[in-house]
A protein has these predicted regions:
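Short beta-strand-turn/beta-hairpin segments enriched in glycine/proline and small hydrophobics
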Residues: 1-13, 30-46, 79
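Short histidine-centered loop motifs in beta-beta connectors
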Residues: 16-20, 24, 53-56
Length: 81
């Protein structure tokens, strides 16, 4: 079973969380939306599966490299964009 770890690519704030642990996701689905320098940055999953763990909450400030979520291969869902 493969696990995708999704990390913050820059210092940012968690603006909106769109999934929860156990949510089925398709490749390309948006998991959370970050905000940095007044820009909204969608964080996407690269694989279909199930959200295993969610490590952020709305309003939290992230540093580059912080773990946002894990996605476990398996359950798939239609893309929600």
């Amino acid at each position: 079973m493969a696990v995708e770890e999704i990390h913050a690519e820059m210092v940012s704030s968690v603006w909106k969380v769109l999934v929860e642990p156990g949510s089925a996701v398709a490749a390309g689905d948006t998991l959370v939306i970050l905000e940095s320098m007044k820009m909204e940055i969608p964080v996407l999953t690269e694989r279909a599966g199930t959200v295993g763990e969610l490590h952020v909450v709305e309003g939290e400030v992230l540093q580059e490299g912080d773990l946002i979520a894990t996605v476990v291969d398996g359950t798939t869902a239609p893309s929600r964009g």
